[in-house]
């Protein structure tokens, strides 16, 4: 299913706009990919506008965590989702997106990548 991202058919006053053309394919978008915490990693590569590709991450169990004090990147297992500034209900559903605070084996980290579009979870360790 797609989402229409073009202009709505209403004016600011509530009146109807006269349609000058039909809806176009470039005005369509996708449903959001809600990356969840799982026991295995599931990805899918999709084609986007201009023949480019996006890697959708459906479930993830590990994250690439950057430790600023040691200046090293470590692969760590994700334990749970602690906080999510995008939506507070995402915490109990264990949904991970950019800005989410996750608990890992190394410690708490904030997600810096966009898992639904990058296909990987990169995070920065919080101290």
From Swiss-Prot:
Gene Ontology biological process terms from the UniProt entry: translation
Pfam family, one: Ribosomal_S8e
Gene Ontology CC terms, in alphabetical order: ribonucleoprotein complex; ribosome
InterPro entries reported for this sequence: Ribosomal_eS8, Ribosomal_eS8_CS, Ribosomal_protein_eS8_arc, Ribosomal_Se8/biogenesis_NSA2
Origin: domain of life: Archaea
Ranges where the record places region Disordered: 1-31
Family according to the record: Belongs to the eukaryotic ribosomal protein eS8 family.
Self-association state and partner proteins as the record states: Part of the 30S ribosomal subunit.
PANTHER family: 40S RIBOSOMAL PROTEIN S8
Protein name according to UniProt: Small ribosomal subunit protein eS8
